[in-house]
């Protein structure tokens, strides 16, 4: 009550932010007349002037009013489009490293040109990140003439480009591209074998379009580069035959009463669990097939991999549906993005799930993969010095943006008032009744010449509805992953009078639906359009546009509520752009997934008791509130999953930063002989300690064992027993020095034989090869650790703390093994000439260039307690001093821990 009173008197925080920014808008507007008087050449010269002023110490904030005014004037001349005041406000919010929530049709693409130009003046590179290749190419081509007029270069970064093309794209002042491609390039750069193979520059400034889709929806799915591992396709086929023999237990066991099924399903977390009866049955089936020994348990160390195969097969059959979660195309299983409804070719589920789905569908089973490199979007985007984003729907997730990325959300006012009529939801008992009501609504709109966009949450729903409309002979277009290629044409026609378009979720997002149809696409179809033809097309469009406005604008029909309110709002947001007329309504049934999981049987029974007749619907604010509460529950759970994923990945991220930073230093240094000497000293000291314990009596020394070990690891025979017999005063310290000196001399002789430059090159090649191999193995070990870490909760231990402790131990062990490997290889190998070095480099390149897959992992709920506090975004990383605490969290000094490698 009191907070509402204060808001009314002083305005909300958002209102105050907008009010302050409007002062700068007034300054920009005041410059317009002055800039209009400039010639094209004088306007172009402004870029060089701004760069000079920036180099002389002026900040970008000082240049902002003039720079924005110049971009607006250039846009008027090049594109014939003038930035509205709300777009100037949005540009300022983006420059400040915040999220601008701008409604559909408010011109986000044009808004992004303002901060992109301003930050592009630094020459450090600006990344404009979109959700798909089509939008990246479209926006780059649309804005290229504007930026080139102002003297800035534009690049486009999409999949399938050659390394040289990628380099050129990244060297540009402004680079458009997809979130996946920027992330994969970062991982590839950190797998490069030479500096020349790297393409990215240091990450400076990024504007993320559809920021909610990229930083929220896709944040649960890490980017993974993987390579093929062992072939186990026969095992998947064998286990696939077992699933039909297992029975579902409809209800959980109650108060010790044993159920009558083999497994249970948890729809909320997309998991299956074997019952005690199911475990016994699976063991019998595996024994029959000769996969485990008689009497062996499913949970024994030898059978634990079989257990993961069984769970993968059960999930594939019972939780993943064809045409909802994936499609089968050309003998291949292709994942469907649950948020956009698009097919994601090339992406695969991990942990054997994709192979299990392939076995279920009877298509070719591709090999499992080994992770070579991975990063979450949360940790990738936090590498940028400044991160900003824009979307039509961010306010519902403002807390998550702030707590995880440190990004404030500012809601932009619309250029024209919003007049869309958002009607209350209608809830029916059955799906059949719901679809009948939708049909009546569509027919009514079509008769009045009102275009309709029907949003579904899966391909299956869109095809069911399409079949329903075909029976009624209603002409319509379908926009889903199966018709991805025709997307642009379907969207451009969606605003025509009486047109019915069915779209999965937010397919076609990023492209505005223009009332009356898109006249630009009509002009583009003509080879050499004359002014008269264009005028005719525009006149015809104006008649259609006015007819659609009179009919009520674009009508949105939602066939189901999504688990996120934001995605429902995105669907609604397709209508009512730029003050246009429009309307929206959601039709629900008690059979819908969200209603079934959260409303349950109680509400269905209540509706039946109320004596609802067939075709009758409930329409009440209470129902809307109940649905919103259900959505909030799902959103809260998904937020916990993302936050938890981040906390676990932060542990790996600290290690990733250490490894990648040392790898980059290795690439940049021509001579790493000092590092090799230090490593050799450490390894040798540890080996000697094992056989000659520090400050121990000579009688306790294992001298023959030490001689044998040195022969094995360093290929050097030292007569230590003879040295001790010849010199009674050869104590421990002097003996150590003599051994180290002898090993060093042997290495020096190798250097003299081969040549200094050849050995330096060989050292670097071996160091890189060993580091990459150990890092891959470490990633696999970390994966296995995380999969089972939640079980520590049963032992009253905090899974996260246990994960941190054990992952640090694994990391320390990896560094030690790496040192031993490097020293051992360099000591043993016989390098005769430069060709040997080239052979090692070529061998490494071949292994690195083996077929790779770029994918999003299907993330499980990692278990453990919910994190107490979220990590706030750090925009820059200070250099870690050798005596500072190690960033990996061990509590040791950096030089005694991860810094040992350096």
Swiss-Prot record:
Residues 836-902 are annotated as: Disordered. One of its GO terms (cellular component) is cell envelope Sec protein transport complex. The keyword Ion transport does not apply. It is found in: Cell inner membrane; Cytoplasm. One of its GO terms (molecular function) is ATP binding. Residues 840-863 have a biased composition (Basic and acidic residues). ATP binds at residues 87, 105-109, 512. Belongs to the SecA family. Part of the Sec protein translocase complex. Interacts with the SecYEG preprotein conducting channel. Has a central role in coupling the hydrolysis of ATP to the transfer of proteins into and across the cell membrane, serving both as a receptor for the preprotein-SecB complex and as an ATP-driven molecular motor driving the stepwise translocation of polypeptide chains across the membrane. This is Protein translocase subunit SecA. The gene is secA.
């Amino acid at each position: 009550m009191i907070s509402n009173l204060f808001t009314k008197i002083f305005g909300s925080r958002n209102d105050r932010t907008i009010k302050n920014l409007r002062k700068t808008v007034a300054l920009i507007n005041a410059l317009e007349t002055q800039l209009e008087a400039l010639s094209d050449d004088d306007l172009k010269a402004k870029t060089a002037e701004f760069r000079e002023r920036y180099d002389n110490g002026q900040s970008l904030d000082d240049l902002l009013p003039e720079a924005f005014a110049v971009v607006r004037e250039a846009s008027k001349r090049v594109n014939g489009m003038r930035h509205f005041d709300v777009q100037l406000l949005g540009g300022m919010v983006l420059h400040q490293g915040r999220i601008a929530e701008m409604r559909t049709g408010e011109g986000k693409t044009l808004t992004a040109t303002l901060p992109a130009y301003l930050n592009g003046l630094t020459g450090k590179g600006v990344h404009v990140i979109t959700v798909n290749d089509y939008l990246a190419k479209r926006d780059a081509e649309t804005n290229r003439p504007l930026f080139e007029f102002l003297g800035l270069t534009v690049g486009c970064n999409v999949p399938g480009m050659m390394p040289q093309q990628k380099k050129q794209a990244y060297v540009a002042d402004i680079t458009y591209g997809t979130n996946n491609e920027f992330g994969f390039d970062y991982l590839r750069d950190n797998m490069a074998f030479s500096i020349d193979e790297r393409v990215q520059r240091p990450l400076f400034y990024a504007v993320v379009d559809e920021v909610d889709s990229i930083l929220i929806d896709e944040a649960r799915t890490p980017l993974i580069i993987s390579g093929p591992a062992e072939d186990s396709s026969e095992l998947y086929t064998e286990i696939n035959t077992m699933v039909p023999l297992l029975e579902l237990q409809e209800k959980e066991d109650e108060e010790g009463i044993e159920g009558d099924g083999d497994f249970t399903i948890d729809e909320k977390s997309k998991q299956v669990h074997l019952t005690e009866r199911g475990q016994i049955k699976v063991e019998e089936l595996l024994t029959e097939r000769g996969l485990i020994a008689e009497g062996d348990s499913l949970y024994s160390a030898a059978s634990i991999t079989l257990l993961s195969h069984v769970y993968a097969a059960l999930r594939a059959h019972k939780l993943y549906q064809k045409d909802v979660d994936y499609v089968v195309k050309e003998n291949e299983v292709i994942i469907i993005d649950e948020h956009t409804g698009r097919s994601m070719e090339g992406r695969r589920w991990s942990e054997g799930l994709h192979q299990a789905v392939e076995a279920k569908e009877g298509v070719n089973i591709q090999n499992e993969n080994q992770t070579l490199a991975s990063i979450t979007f949360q940790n990738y985007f936090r590498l940028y010095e400044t991160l900003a984003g824009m979307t039509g729907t961010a306010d519902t997730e403002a807390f998550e943006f702030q707590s995880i990325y440190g990004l404030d959300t500012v809601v932009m006012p619309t250029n024209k008032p919003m007049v869309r009529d958002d009607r209350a939801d209608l809830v029916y008992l059955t799906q059949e009744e719901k679809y009948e009501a939708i049909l009546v609504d569509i027919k009514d709109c079509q008769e009045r010449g009102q275009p309709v966009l029907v949003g579904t949450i899966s391909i299956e729903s869109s095809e069911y509805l399409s079949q329903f409309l075909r029976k009624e002979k209603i002409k319509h277009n379908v926009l889903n992953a199966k018709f991805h290629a025709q997307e642009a044409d379907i969207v451009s026609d969606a605003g025509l009078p009486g047109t019915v378009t069915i779209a999965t979720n937010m397919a076609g997002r990023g492209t505005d639906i223009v009332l009356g149809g898109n006249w630009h696409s009509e002009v583009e179809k003509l080879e050499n359009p004359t002014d008269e033809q264009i005028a005719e097309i525009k006149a015809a469009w104006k008649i259609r546009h006015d007819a659609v406005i009179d009919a009520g604008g674009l009508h949105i029909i939602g066939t189901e509520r999504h688990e996120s309110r934001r995605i429902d709002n995105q669907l609604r947001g397709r209508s009512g752009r730029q003050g246009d007329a429009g309307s929206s309504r959601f039709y629900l049934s008690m059979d819908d997934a969200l209603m079934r999981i959260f409303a349950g049987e109680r509400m269905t029974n209540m509706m039946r008791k109320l004596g609802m007749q067939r075709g009758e619907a409930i329409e009440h604010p209470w129902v809307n509130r109940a649905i919103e509460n259900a959505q909030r529950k799902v959103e809260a759970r998904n937020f916990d999953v993302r936050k938890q994923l981040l906390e676990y990945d932060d542990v790996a991220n600290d290690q990733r930063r250490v490894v990648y930073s040392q790898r980059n230093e290795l690439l940049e240094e021509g001579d790493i002989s000092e590092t090799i000497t230090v490593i050799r000293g450490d390894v040798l000291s540890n080996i000697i300690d094992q056989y000659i314990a520090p400050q121990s009596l000579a009688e306790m020394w294992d001298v023959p064992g030490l001689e044998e070990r040195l022969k094995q690891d360093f290929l050097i025979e030292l007569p230590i027993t003879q040295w001790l017999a010849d010199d009674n005063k050869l104590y421990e310290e002097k003996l150590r020095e003599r051994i180290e000196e002898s090993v060093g001399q042997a290495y020096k002789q190798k250097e003299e034989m081969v040549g200094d430059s050849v050995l330096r090159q060989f050292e670097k090649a071996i160091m890189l090869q060993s580091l990459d191999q150990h890092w891959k193995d470490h990633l696999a070990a970390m994966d296995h650790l995380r999969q089972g870490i939640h079980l520590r909760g049963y032992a009253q231990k905090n899974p996260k703390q246990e994960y941190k402790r054990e992952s640090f131990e694994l990391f320390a062990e990896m560094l030690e093994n790496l040192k031993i490997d490097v020293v051992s290889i360099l000591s043993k190998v016989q390098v005769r000439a430069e060709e040997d070095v080239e052979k090692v480099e070529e061998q490494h390149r071949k292994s690195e260039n083996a077929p790779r897959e770029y994918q999003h992992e299907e993330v499980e709920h990692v278990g453990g307690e919910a994190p107490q506090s979220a990590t706030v975004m750090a925009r820059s990383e200070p250099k870690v001093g050798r005596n500072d605490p190690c960033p990996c969290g061990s509590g040791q000094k950096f030089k005694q821990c991860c810094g040992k490698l350096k």
